[in-house]
């Protein structure tokens, strides 16, 4: 009788072509593998450093036949200096505090998530996500994932590290050996004047710096894509190219 032993090496798969969400007229393909088992965090670190992104228990990266427009971006947190506009954003949101929780969904989170999608990404690929879909996005992780909730500071926040009142913004974040990876973030769309998306990235840079971690991973940047243009404002950063990670000022 032949015995079958589980393989220690990850198995990779290739998706069928589908319309690219970033470049009109292009088609995308992805290579992916499953992040499960006791080595999931170690594998996720290695793959993220190689340009992969995590979605639930899947790690993926673009594998398009004729296009290399998607570029992995990571901020050099220890060397980062905020611009004057970013300093203004930090000051504007100094009344907020982010609290890291276990990766557990809540109805309050989903309500904000739904409001954000309906206002900002009504026709996007996530627009029809149900509360169960959201729960899977948060919970289905075999790596060190946190939900960071942002609320207004209260009189005891300096002691408790927690905010009070309504939930204003949320970041789903992976803790890695060499940095923080921002998996997904959303916020109250009625507070545009706060630039909450920028603020959450700045807060993650602060968290990485305080923890002695060198990087904040932002995922992919596509030159010419307006929805991704914000990612290259946080310098210095590194872009993953054919010769590895290359510094960009």
UniProtKB/Swiss-Prot annotation:
Known catalytic reactions:
N-terminal L-glutamyl-[protein] + L-leucyl-tRNA(Leu) = N-terminal L-leucyl-L-glutamyl-[protein] + tRNA(Leu) + H(+); N-terminal L-aspartyl-[protein] + L-leucyl-tRNA(Leu) = N-terminal L-leucyl-L-aspartyl-[protein] + tRNA(Leu) + H(+)
Give the E.C. number(s).
Answer: 2.3.2.29
Keyword Acyltransferase assigned to the entry: answer is: yes
- Its top-level enzyme class, in one word, is transferase
| GO cellular component assignments | cytoplasm
Annotated GO biological processes are: ubiquitin-dependent protein catabolic process via the N-end rule pathway
According to its UniProt record, where is this protein located? Answer: Cytoplasm
- Could you tell me the keywords of this UniProt record? Acyltransferase, Cytoplasm, Transferase
Coiled-coil-forming residues are none
A GO molecular function term, named singly, is: leucyl-tRNA--protein transferase activity
Q: What does this protein do?
A: Functions in the N-end rule pathway of protein degradation where it conjugates Leu from its aminoacyl-tRNA to the N-termini of proteins containing an N-terminal aspartate or glutamate.
Per the similarity annotation, which family is this? Answer: Belongs to the R-transferase family. Bpt subfamily.
Protein name, please? Aspartate/glutamate leucyltransferase
Q: Which organism is it from?
A: Chelativorans sp. (strain BNC1)
Q: What is the lineage of its organism?
A: Bacteria, Pseudomonadati, Pseudomonadota, Alphaproteobacteria, Hyphomicrobiales
